Amino acid sequence: MKSIKNFYNEDGWKNTSNNSKDAELFEDLRPSAKKYVSKCRLRILNHIPKNGGSNILDFASGPIQYNEYLKFSKNFKKRHCVDFSKIAIDKAKKKLGSKGKYYCKDFLKINFKKNYFDCVVSLHTIYHIHKSKQAITIKKLIDISKKDSPIIIVYSNPNTFINYIKKVFFIKRHIKKDKLYFFCHKNNWWQQFS
């Protein structure tokens, strides 16, 4: 199993003819799905404060690879991008410039102020963190967010039938060496944070 850090530093964010290795492996890039996938990405905006604020945290920002993702920070003064891939951070800098603040390191090793962020976004990230560190990560996200500010986490439901089907197709479509760490807690695990 390849480490997440190695995958994204070596291959994941490299440009391909279509998009990126990450997108080719894990996203639906069919032309027929383009409009639907774009709408899914934009649904995140429904949870981001319309009046924005000073700081939004993009945890595991990647290169901010889609235009829809740029809209997340349009009403914020600064977008703080955290990712341990230098390739991702360099690409994010090209897109955001001085509107961003960039951290190329392990999130748990960054000392953010408590109650600092007006909004937090984490897309498809938490389940790639070792299961023993997922709760610590969520608690830190809560700690550094302002009271009553949204923490938007896109996770995976381990109990859906579609996950079983996806596993079959994933095994058929991809070489095993590209398999990345993935662990989803049961839905009731999330209750500890309410």
Each predicted region: which residue ranges?
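A short glycine-rich, Lys/Arg-flanked "PGG" loop and its adjoining helix->strand segment in the class I
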Residues: 135-147
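Class I (Rossmann-like) S-adenosyl-L-methionine-dependent methyltransferase catalytic domain
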Residues: 1-53, 62-100, 104-111, 152-194
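Local beta-strand N-terminus motif with an aromatic residue
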Residues: 53, 117-118
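Conserved beta-strand/loop positions that form the S-adenosyl-L-methionine
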Residues: 59
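Short catalytic micro-motifs in class I SAM-dependent methyltransferases
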Residues: 124-128
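A conserved beta-strand element that flanks and buttresses the S-adenosyl-L-methionine
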Residues: 121
